Regions:
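Intrinsically disordered, low-complexity proline/glycine-rich segments
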Residues: 1-84
């Protein structure tokens, strides 16, 4: 099932959300850098999951419902770009 792609500025579901603050320097979705597995979120968190079939710079791209190291899922992503 395809899920919305996560970009810099998108966030997780924790009560105080963590935002993606780093991403690809040359792969963009809706004009924003794509957030990939291992990219940074606020407060020292990182994206711990990513696509196993779609990559940016050799790293799995983040999608809505992937997990951040705080233990919560990403809930905000692109409204027009999706990946498996």
């Amino acid at each position: 099932m395809n899920k919305s792609v996560v970009r810099v500025g998108d966030y997780c579901a924790e009560a105080t959300p963590h935002f993606c603050i780093s991403g690809s320097n040359n792969v963009f979705v809706n004009g924003k850098p794509v957030c990939r597995k291992g990219d940074n979120f606020t407060e020292g968190r990182v994206l711990t999951e990513g696509s196993k079939t779609v990559f940016a710079n050799g790293l799995g791209i983040g999608r809505v419902e992937d997990i951040v190291s705080c233990g919560f899922k990403v809930i905000k992503g692109s409204e027009t770009v999706f990946a498996g």
